[in-house]
Regions:
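Phosphate-group recognition and catalysis centered on beta-loop-alpha active-site segments
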Residues: 1-118
Length: 118
């Protein structure tokens, strides 16, 4: 049976961040579910919503920002710890987690998904 950490351990750490994914694995997940979107300059990043408003200190659509701009975003969560993390690229995610014997569920978001090349 696959136990997915949905956006990581998003009840305890900011969703779709390294801290959330590692915590999900520490809590016993053997799979990670995440969302991939493209930035304005074509970088694939992990983020669920179309806009940054709900979970970050930035406003507006993710696709309107470049990766250099998004690197500065602070990602908060539904957790009340006051802790924040940052947006990561899909490449960084793969480099960190492909070494583990786990499953992945990747949802491609946005209007440009047919143009995504891995």
């Amino acid at each position: 049976m696959i136990n997915y950490a949905h956006r990581g351990a998003s009840d305890y750490a900011p969703e779709n961040t390294l801290s959330s994914f590692y915590l999900g694995l520490l809590q016993g997940a053997n799979g990670i579910e995440t969302d991939v979107q493209k930035t304005k300059d074509g970088v694939l990043v992990l983020f669920h919503d179309d806009t940054l408003d709900r979970v970050s200190n930035m406003q507006g659509k993710l696709c309107d920002y470049t990766w250099d701009e998004l690197k500065e975003a602070e990602i908060y969560g539904s957790c009340t710890t006051g802790f924040y993390d940052r947006i990561i690229t899909f490449r960084e995610f793969l480099e960190k987690f492909c070494r583990y014997d786990i499953h992945f569920a990747i949802e491609l978001k946005g209007t440009d998904v047919e143009k995504v090349k891995l």
